[in-house]
Design a protein with these regions (language model features):
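Bacterial N-terminal signal peptides
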Residues: 6-17
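Extracellular carbohydrate-recognition regions
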Residues: 23-56
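Extracellular polysaccharide-targeting segments
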Residues: 25-28, 171-197
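Extracellular ligand-binding interfaces
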Residues: 76-157, 173-179
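Extended amphipathic alpha-helical segments with heptad-repeat/coiled-coil character used for oligomerization
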Residues: 435, 444-512
Length: 862
């Protein structure tokens, strides 16, 4: 067994990445903590839980806790009831290195119809020898336990330096629940955490266990081709040095089928590049694991997949011109860079001349199309004539794409990233190609730039999540109100299990480590408190008519996009939207799969998300429960969001993307059905989960009543509101209908504005108190000229709440606190913990004891 390093908690420590910090509070990790716990039947010992199948009787509780962000909770029910409950030293095979002077500390709470006054407790070493005694437990509230190990009876030769688990033997009722928190050992000033660990312990354990976690994930991938087809399995076998001869034979037989198939595949071309750099004769990692025959065939297939698409003239265009979609674009360009590097160092290929047609972007993306009567010889590509007539080899391409990629990542540090930022799946694809540049570019400066970009991207992620559940507004988040894949990567980087399947295998082996400040930010939501996180979005089109030749498959997003991403982040919930200029010119990506709403700490299945109500029965893509293809106008100030399905917006599509029907459809708000409590009153819906509350109000006028009361104008003004009328209208209460097993409401007016407001138990002891405060807020619909088109005015809860004025009938810019929304927000990223002036390329991250500065500007060409 590997033994855990015992930590000193009173000194200043220096990490491997050169950052220094003084020890802060301990941190719990949402993925690890419940995995440490297991149960057993009477007479048996608990076993190390399976990484793939942790014990489902254990979960986390953000509301009832004593330390950190959450406690671990055990729920006894049916088969889940047990007589032995405990926790292991590590899910990766490490053990506790203690001594007889150590003291076990933990908080424990029991809720049961039968509560014994004391429990048998045992610590077990790797040889099965035990340290036994009893521990006293209080009543139904929390009990803090300090258990000196010297007070327990040790079996002969019990090894204090090789302890693998701690368990309690007890009898519980069928309705029992147990909470554990703050579990750790102390001996003098020595500290070793179990559920709650110091930052240094967590980072050290992440490094020490990485090889084990890689091996476990890749072994699962190697044995199960369903996790990504045979090619991912082949990679895993080569990495683990297992069945190498058999894998080589299969690769040799299968490569030709991929020579010309699906040239825009998100998998195959970057896969071939990685196989070359990991396993070819020239590899600096595992040289020679593919045979010379496989290597030769791989190079031939890679050349055929890339030589036409790798057009040097496209490396001279804007890095904000995106071919096809954002992830496809970076896939193609990253592969152009890396394949050029491969071929410039291969004797058989280094002197070959590339076609460099100069036709434009998106070669082979879809059908050839029409190029013009004078360009009948073209079989593919765009209508541009960019070729300069010169001959370029692989080295020329490599240096052109190297410089392009440097600018690409610097630009995204300056203006914001990505169009598909926070997407449920597409951003994960994009990171595949970010990684390809990071690991295989062959240029030290570019590697440093991408390393900084990783740090920035994960800092952005960490600030808008609670226990791995990502808040923040999302684009291209199709058909699903739930979470995304990025948490799978982050779980691994924080020390959790890896995933060796098709879209994740690369993240295991790139050597990337999180900076200490990002590690802390991700795991210390409680200490960060409540804050606003505001950042600039990207994806507004250049509004060029006609579009430049060669961009028939390309987005033109080289703009200072007028998209403001806004999140109000608390330890209990995150409320988010994107506020965008009414005249912003959208791309076909920036309107796709728009997610906004509220996520909650206590239960990731509790969400409040605006959705489209899809009723298609044609079997097509829109035959889904919820449709995210909606466009919104929004205004948010801290815990209050006012949003409405947009009546109008503007969009430019590349030639290939059809100008389909507008997304306008019946609008709904998704709630789910996992709430602790739900109430409806005076047109509002109130919900509670854990320490959070929310209030939702579709705001609609009482049309029938108003028409009965209204004073009519005469003459040609009879269709307008009269100047003699009252300025406001009566609000309707019956504004929505529950649908789909009462999990979602459908608005009776698809253009009705919706108010979403959050609250916390720190401010309101009960949901009733929150309801009373919300119902007392100032809410009105003001008339304009045309009946039915109003201006909503609302001020939320709290003394610092700002008045939001929102015209629901036109594209007028809303005001917050009397000021118009500034869509040219001066900061690219801004929260109390991360700041960057727009287009500066300088990012400053700070917490109370940690800091990190990212300087992209120093890499710019002078």
């Amino acid at each position: 067994m590997k033994k855990m390093i015992v930590l000193l908690i009173l000194t200043c420590v220096t990490l491997l990445n050169g950052q220094s910090f003084a020890q802060e509070k301990t941190l719990d990790f949402w993925d690890e903590a419940p995995r440490l716990f297991n149960t057993a039947v009477a007479g048996a010992d608990i076993a190390q839980p399976s990484v793939q199948r942790p014990n489902k009787a254990f979960g986390i509780d953000h509301a009832d806790k004593k330390a950190g962000d959450f406690s671990v909770v055990y729920t006894a029910s049916g088969k889940g009831r047990s007589n032995v409950i405990g926790f292991v030293s590590s899910i990766w095979g490490e053990t506790w290195a203690l001594d007889a002077q150590a003291v076990l500390h933990l908080h424990i709470k029991i809720k049961s119809s039968e509560i014994p006054s004391s429990w048998p407790v045992e610590l077990v070493d790797s040889a099965g020898r035990k340290l036994s005694g009893r521990v006293s437990i209080g009543g139904n509230g929390w009990t803090e336990i300090h258990l000196p190990l010297k007070s327990l009876k040790a079996d002969d030769s019990f090894d204090y330096e090789d302890i693998k688990l701690c368990q309690f033997r007890l009898k519980l009722s069928n309705d029992a629940k147990l909470w554990f928190d703050g579990v750790h050992f102390m001996s003098g000033n020595r500290y070793i955490g179990v559920t709650d660990k110091s930052l240094r312990q967590r980072m050290d354990e992440e490094r020490r266990t990485r090889d084990s976690r890689i091996a476990l994930a890749l072994e699962a991938s190697r044995k199960d081709e369903k996790t990504g087809g045979p090619w991912t399995s082949y990679f895993a076998s080569l990495y683990l040095n297992k069945d190498v001869a058999e894998v080589n034979a299969k690769m040799l037989a299968g490569l030709d089928a991929h020579r010309h198939e699906d040239p825009w595949s998100l998998f195959m071309t970057p896969y071939l590049c990685r196989v070359y750099y990991f396993f070819s004769a020239k590899s600096d990692k595992f040289p020679g694991r593919i045979t010379p025959e496989v290597e030769k065939k791989l190079l031939s297939v890679l050349w055929d997949r890339t030589y036409e698409k790798n057009d040097i003239h496209w490396a001279k265009q804007s890095t904000w011109w995106l071919d096809g979609s954002e992830n496809h674009d970076l896939n193609a360009k990253a592969c152009n860079l890396v394949s050029s590097r491969i071929f410039m160092n291969e004797p058989e290929y280094k002197d070959r001349i590339y076609p460099d047609y100069g036709y434009g972007g998106g070669l082979h993306y879809g059908a050839p199309s029409y190029h013009g009567k004078d360009l009948k010889d073209r079989k593919h590509g765009g209508r541009a004539t960019l070729s300069d007539g010169k001959e370029y080899k692989a080295a020329d391409h490599y240096y052109a794409w190297r410089d392009f990629m440097k600018e690409y990542f610097i630009e995204r540090s300056k203006r914001g990233f990505f169009v598909e930022r926070s997407s449920r799946g597409y951003m994960a694809h994009t990171f595949n190609f970010v990684d390809l540049v990071y690991t295989c570019s062959g240029d030290n400066d570019l590697t440093q730039i991408v390393k900084q970009f990783y740090d920035l991207a994960w800092a952005d992620w960490a600030q808008e999540q609670i226990s791995g559940s990502r808040g923040g507004t999302k684009t291209r988040h199709h058909y699903n109100i739930g979470n995304g894949r990025m948490a799978i990567y982050m779980t691994y980087y924080l020390g959790g299990p890896g995933n060796g399947s098709i879209w994740f295998y690369w993240s295991l082996i790139n050597g990337y480590e999180l900076p200490a400040i990002v590690f802390q930010t991700a795991l210390d939501r409680t200490s960060l408190g409540n804050y606003e996180y505001i950042s600039r979005g990207v994806g507004e089109e250049e509004n060029k008519w006609p579009r430049p030749l060669g961009t028939e498959r390309t987005l033109l997003c080289d703009t200072e996009s007028r998209f403001v991403k806004y999140s109000y982040v608390t330890p209990d919930y995150i409320l988010s939207t994107q506020m965008e200029h009414p005249a912003a010119m959208h791309s076909h990506l920036s309107t796709a799969g728009r997610w906004q709403g509220m996520v909650f700490a206590q239960d990731p299945e509790c969400r409040i998300v605006t959705v489209g109500m899809s009723y298609s029965n044609d079997g097509g893509a829109r035959n889904k429960k919820y449709d995210m293809e909606m466009m919104y106008r929004s205004a948010q100030s801290k815990s209050v969001l006012v949003t409405q399905q947009a009546r109008r917006w503007y969009q430019i599509n590349p030639d290939w993307f059809p100008a389909q029907e507008r997304y306008q459809m019946p609008m709904g708000v998704y709630f789910g059905n996992r709430w602790d409590r739900k109430e409806e009153k005076e047109g509002w819906i109130f919900v509670e989960t854990g320490n959070a509350y929310a209030a939702v109000r579709p705001v609609v006028w009482d049309e029938v009543w108003e028409k009965e009361q209204s004073v009519k104008n005469k003459g040609n003004q009879k269709y307008f509101n009269s100047h003699k009328q009252k300025p406001t209208v009566k609000l309707a209460v019956d504004t929505y209908t529950w649908k789909r097993d009462n999990t979602v409401i459908e608005l009776k007016d698809k253009f009705a504005p919706v108010i979403i407001e959050g609250g916390q138990k720190r401010d309101y002891a009960t949901l009733d108190a929150f309801m009373a405060d919300v119902l007392d807020n100032s809410l009105a619909l003001y008339k304009t000229v045309v009946p039915g088109y109003h201006t909503l005015v609302y001020t939320g809860c709290g003394e610092d709440a700002k008045e939001i004025v929102f015209n629901t009938g036109s594209l007028e810019i809303p005001t917050i606190g009397g000021a118009y929304i500034d869509y040219a927000y001066p900061m690219a990223f801004e929260s109390p913990y991360m700041k960057s002036a727009y287009k500066s390329g300088l990012i400053e991250m700070n917490t109370k004891r940690l800091n990190l500065n990212l300087d992209f500007a120093r890499f710019e060409k002078k």
